């Protein structure tokens, strides 16, 4: 009896997989996509107007969609009798990484996932100095992203939009450049808190020397900051 039931189930599946009743036609809903287009999702999933929803491999389709550089996760659901629902979760860049061949988007997890092209949004902090790939470069990138995450926490004097560039030297030292301050802030190998940087900037504004500041060294000494000025104070 069990063998007969199994055989009957196979026959029913095979029959349903050929019925026009289960063809999706244009009944495909795509959700969550902004960067990747609907047409790209459909093409990568392999679904078309002749696709039978019973025979369609939803797991394979999701895996195919996830090969797109901007897609972090894809899920495909059947809505019987003849509709498919595709949910997309796209990567969210937090920085741009400068390489010899161009700029690349980087997400919070440190994945370098897509090259920026003409017309793309470039309003992200720029990470420079990390030229190579591999474990060492990944470690430098992780430290840079941790610093950016710290800086991007809002502060009245230090808004998240203020970060322009974070340069990483070969030995891992970091130098920060802000949008409204033309001088570099050397962070060195340390990871100063956002409040530490903001406190230094507040002092420069309060003493009205922000305009003549040449550089700031946040790692000059233990609990000491070195501020170099373009002109000496009178």
What are these regions (language model features)?
Residues 1-27, 39, 43-52, 59-63, ...:
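Charged, solvent-exposed interaction patches on well-folded alpha/beta domains
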Residues 70-73:
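Glycine-centered tight turns that cap/initiate beta-strands
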